[in-house]
């Protein structure tokens, strides 16, 4: 599937036409439109959805689809990992990704994940439903359709896919879109907050909790000024120190011991800022939050 590609993507894909690879090219219209076009022409029992940028580990596809031997499983998600990081900033984003993977594995043990890894997952063809044109989180909307049809969404940690490490500048708009998509999900799937959601507690704590976190932190800072003096100084001072470290991180050189602490504070702060900016989806068209991720250029 080529969604208005302007580089050599189409030509490269065409080189594999003799090996059964079929290229479907559509005018640029966003990922939902591209996926909907693909759903109209693909067949088979299992759909494998991948992005072109990531690198799949050998045997990862076999490991991924093996789980469909369980008839209760509707979606299986691979595990995204980042390649070696060059900076503390990239390392912290990689650690955040590992934490996300851990959460998904734990949710699988309970029942189901709340979505899938968009660059590498598989779904039973009969469960894949078309996307509304304004959808921000296709990798949540499509899997959750299977979830509400009574199937499980599970993680397969042995089906690994690799991506290049990213900077906070690259990650920020993507995180804004992801968190804004959580607001949008409440409109697309209002049953998420109803009794039909067998993962209700997990959705509220995992998805909605992240949206509320910056507001709770702001309330914590303000309320700290009403504490007794000895506690007020400690609580306010600790919070301001954390925000201060996040602020100065950009001016500190790599290799400085303090950088490991300030980079972590900055990463956390940027994620909180992204959660605040995500509320923009309530006031602007959702597709204005789409920004293509720039692929880092590998050095020879």
What are these regions (language model features)?
Residues 47:
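Short aromatic/hydrophobic "clamp" motif used to bind/position activated sugar donors
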Residues 288-300:
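Membrane-proximal intrinsically disordered regions of secretory-pathway and membrane-system proteins
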Residues 27-28, 32-34, 38-40, 44, ...:
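Long helical/loop segments within the catalytic core of UDP-sugar-dependent glycosyltransferases
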Residues 210-286:
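Membrane-embedded multi-pass helical conduit in multi-pass membrane proteins
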Residues 3, 50-52, 132, 157:
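Active-site acidic Asp-centered loop
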Residues 68-100, 133-138, 142-203, 267, ...:
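Catalytic donor/gating beta->alpha subdomain of glycosyltransferases that bind UDP-sugars
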Residues 10-14, 31-40, 143-144:
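Short, conserved alpha-helix that lines the donor NDP-sugar binding/gating region
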